[in-house]
Each structure stands twice: as structure tokens, then as C-alpha cells.
Amino acid sequence: RDFKDVLKEAQSLGYAEADPTFDIEGIDAAHKLTILGSIAFGMPLQFDKTYTEGITKIEQQDVLYAEELGYRIKHVGISRKVKNGIEQRVHPTLIPERRLIANVDGVMNAVLVKSDAVGPTLYYGAGAGSEPTASAVVADIVDVVRALTTDPENRVPHLAFQPDALSDINILPIEEIETAYYLRMYAIDKPGVVADVTKILGDSDISIEAILQKEPAGNASCIPVIFLTQCVREKTMNGAI
């Protein structure tokens, strides 16, 4: 189905706003990720430092190619503490189809939390629609009222008692993030072209995890070629491209 038709249906059902910009460009997800990251790490993270990318650049063929390779495309927000700062990013991501979070569909949302003692835990539920939204708003109001009616000395601070809660934490720019990449390109249908591309990637120390090469459509002179890479910095990938 065409993206515009699906978006109109989502708007008619109340799952997307009349102005869908915040929904389809990842801005709403980035707002939520900033709040969740602040609570998780006990420090005030800033929304404007969150890398944000929406779903408008995804084409239907990308969904099909991902499934053929054993993945599903999900719009994911990632907040992760690493040795030199915090990764804070929202963008489409390929998730192995066997993972639970890859099977979160429709209006359902999920939050995957990885902690030291418990390991990974998944929280799953409806994330759009009038009733789920109303439920969340009422829950927030109840929390505010409880805080106001609790003696000040017994209140738990929003950022708990983290020793560096007010410190200036380093949010890594997207250029410094290391992750695997999905590349779709069109190559001339002749011997040696794919080898040339792999050499360019290899010259930048980018290792290839998988290659998917499709047959040309009709009399087309170019063929779609899909590369999955191993982890590499965004800056390195951009340089190779």
C-alpha cells in the first residue's frame, strides 16, 4: 500500500495527528526517548541533542529486502550509556525477525530495558489512540497529585539521588556512533561492479555481513544491490559513500 494511504487511515483512526510531522519524522519518539533516558540514567538529557530521523525515506522495497534477509524494519529510539557518553538517537532500524521487539506491530509500542542485575526486560502496550492516551494523561495527573500531597521530606526526586544528576553529560553526535548499516544502491548490470563497491568499502575498513543482489526488472540496465555491514562509525560510512 502507498504510504500516503496508510497515513490517512491512521489519521482517521486517531492514531496519527492531523499534522503528522511529529509522528512520521520521529519528533514525538525523540521527546519520549529524552524523558525515558533522563529517568534511566538519572540526569537531565536534552531533546535538541537527540539525533532524529523519521520513516518517510523508507520505501516498500526496503521492507521486502529486509524480510528476505531475515529482518524487520522498526522505528526505534535508542538511549544507551557508553564509556565516553550517552547515545541518544531515533531512526529506522533493522531488527532480527526472531526478536520480540521485531514483532511489535500496529499501534502497539514496546520499551526494552537492559539493566545490570535483571538483564533485558520488555514492556509492551498500546501507544496510540484516544483511550491509551487518556489513560496515560490520567496516570500523570495522579502522580502529580500524589507528589503534591506527600510531605516534602518523603518525596523521591525526579532524578532520584544520582551523584552526577546535574553534571553536563556528553551526548555523542551521530557521526561518532558505531552501528551496522543497511545500504541499498543501484549498480550497472555488468561483471566487476559489485566487486568495485566492496573494494571501496574495504578500503575504509568496512566489513560486509551480507549481500543481496536482485535480478534487473525488465530491460533495466541497473540492478538493486543491498549490503549489510558490520559495526562501523557513521563518520567512516559517510566518507566511504
Predicted stretch roles:
Residues 4-103, 108-110, 129:
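Substrate-binding/catalytic subdomain of NAD(P)-dependent oxidoreductase enzymes
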Residues 91-116, 130-131, 202-220:
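Low-complexity, glycine/alanine/valine/leucine- and proline-rich hydrophobic stretches
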Residues 115, 121-123, 143-146:
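C-terminal transmembrane helices and immediately adjacent loops/tails
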Residues 29, 133-136:
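Catalytic-loop motifs flanking and including active-site residues across diverse enzymes
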Residues 1:
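Adenosine-phosphate binding glycine-rich loop
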Residues 74-75, 89, 112, 122-124, ...:
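Structured core elements
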Residues 55, 119-121, 125-131:
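Glycine-rich phosphate/pyrophosphate-binding beta-alpha loops
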Residues 136, 141, 145-241:
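A conserved regulatory-domain signal marking ACT and ACT-like small-molecule sensing domains
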